[in-house]
Amino acid sequence: MSDRITKIFVGLAGVGALGFAALTIVKPEAFSDYGLDVNTPQARIVIRSLIGGFELALAGLMLLGGKLGLSLQQRAGLFSVTLLALGSVRILAATYEGLDVLFHQPLGEGALEIIVGLIAAALARRA
């Protein structure tokens, strides 16, 4: 049963990352909500390549990692480490910047990333 849950989780993680990669590559302007200036070609290239490319790589590992010899446990572990790092750094960066007004957004997103990362870690241990 846990293998099936882990397989579904890893698949959903891959599809989610793929969707986020597609959004980022097709419409980098979506990041203007975060205060990023996307008015120059250079900024859009950086957003597409760094964020979109990262998400595409993560999606590839989640969805095609089995073809590379990665087990479900290893893929869930990779996803866990990734989300735990992203969530922790997001919260620490917001704290460092002292974003009193906007703190709820990075705090909420960071907390969600940490929670999903912990679920992935639990599945990685069970698989």
Question: Could you tell me what each predicted segment is?
Answer:
Residues M1-G16:
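Cytosolic juxtamembrane helix and N-cap/initiation of the first transmembrane helix
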Residues G16-V46:
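Hydrophobic transmembrane helix segments
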Residues V38, L99-A111:
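Non-cytosolic membrane-interface motifs at loop->transmembrane helix junctions
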Residues A43-L64, V81-A85:
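Core segments of alpha-helical transmembrane spans in multipass integral membrane proteins
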Residues I51-G53, A57, L107-I115:
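Membrane-embedded alpha-helical segments of multi-pass membrane proteins
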Residues G60-G77:
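Juxtamembrane helix-break-helix junctions at the cytosolic face
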Residues L86-Y96:
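Transmembrane alpha-helical segments of integral membrane proteins
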Residues I114-A127:
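Membrane-water interface at the C-terminal end of transmembrane alpha helices
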